[in-house]
Amino acid sequence: MLFTISFDNLATEATADAFETMLAARAADTAGYRFRLRSIAVGCAEDSPVDLPLAVQVRIVDDVSDGGAGTATNALTPEPHDSLGRASVITGGSKYTAEPTTYGDPLFALEMNLRASLIKEWAPEDAPVVNRDQLLGLLVAPRTSAARTISGCMVIEEF
């Protein structure tokens, strides 16, 4: 079943090349539970986008129970794509005040310009899989010392 977790009008850091977690989803700590990342979207939320390069990454924290998962400012509830579907057991968060400290290597990384939007989709057989008690983060970093306001989402598939 597909769910969307989104954030809207969040400011990036004003420090060049400083990655921060704008959005994250955590798999339940239940045996056999996992989800796939099916797509991400990131774009400028300002009325007049400027010519600003932005780095985007998707990363995983391997084991949230070991600590280092960070602290989200906003708790988010995944919204089902099927209005008659069940609720998700995934928990989400945005705009971390304490960054996760145990991210592994990026599963996806791309440079973009805020005058454009980024949409990345994965086929089910190619999608990154997040296993039990793992945290999947969508991180961004401005490439100049200027904070910008962005919005975005991730679509996840529980299975």
Feature locations, PLM:
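Beta-strand-centric surfaces of beta-sandwich/beta-rich domains
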Residues: 1-159
